[in-house]
Amino acid sequence: MNATPKQKKLISLSQFILEEQLKIPHASGEFSALLSHLVYAAKIVGREVRKAGLLDDILGATEDTNVQGETQMKLDQYADNAFNQSLKICGHLCVLASEEHEDIIPIPGGYNIGKYTMAIDPLDGSSNIDTNVSIGTIFSIHQRLEPNSKEPGNERDLLQKGHLQRCAGYIIYGSSTMLVLSTGKGVSGFTLDPSVGEFLLSHPNMQMPESGDIYSANEGNASYWSPEVQAYLQKIKSIEGGKKPKTARYIGSLVADFHRNLLKGGIFLYPNDTKSSKYPNGKLRLLYEAAPMAFIAEQAGGMAVTVKGERILDLTPKDLHERTTLIIGSKKEVEEFLTFVAK
């Protein structure tokens, strides 16, 4: 007689956070409450993303540009507003920063000042919205420099090294909506069950494969890359000696490309180039793109460095929108890249 298969225990994000909180002596619950406000906004954004093809007022571009000089998509503005409104009045932040705002977003008067900071890219990969490609939200949480202060936070509270992050993660809006996060004790993935409106633990203890066969890069710019990066690219594509070349997979959405490589193994490259003098140090933002993704990568056993070989998590941002190069992925793949930088 066949035994009845053991039913998988479903753990909600709320339960997971509570259980983790109980492991910390004298935990106040402030951090858990902050995450609940983040998740609430993510559910709202995810709902609108799923309906994007049906609503004329969500798809397409606006006439506005953000601080980066990029044309804002309608869903960009919607996502920014959803996270902004949910987070700045939650009572657990002292200051907030967003890709869509040039300056810090202060906590409005009359609301509690918390001990955490958050930097967020409300909608990464938004240029892909109209083509139904996976997009995402990236966030980074630090504890403020003076955790007992009840004064509003400032830019200094945000400009901390990546390895000091208390939590980092991303939400990917794809065939399902998934939240991947780390509080410095490994990486966990939660998938949204729309029938109950809860994120459920679907990927416990996520580990990036030590090596992988995938590389992700915009090779259309390869001629503008440094000789070292070009040499590395030729090496991984080479069939010399009967070697199997790596497979190219590039979506053009950092969250989507990274998420695939986190699960399957591989390397993502976004070097600087000579195509334009606008981004001499790279294009990705250190504070709310590179640093949180690097935190996730390292917690999952991977690596993240600049094109010069600097560890991303050791860099101190000089301003909110500082840009950087990013080489991130499986440990052995990044280590191989570093051998070309060292030459």
Curated annotation (Swiss-Prot):
GO terms for biological process: fructose 1,6-bisphosphate metabolic process; fructose 6-phosphate metabolic process; fructose metabolic process; gluconeogenesis; sucrose biosynthetic process. SUPFAM superfamilies: Carbohydrate phosphatase. Mg(2+) 2 binds at residues 121, 124, 289. InterPro entries: FBPase_C_dom, FBPase_class-1, FBPase_N, FBPtase, Fructose_bisphosphatase_AS. Pathway: Carbohydrate biosynthesis; gluconeogenesis. It is found in: Cytoplasm. Its EC number is 3.1.3.11. GO terms for cellular component: cytosol. Coiled coil: none annotated. Homotetramer. HAMAP family: FBPase_class1. This is Fructose-1,6-bisphosphatase class 1. The gene is fbp.
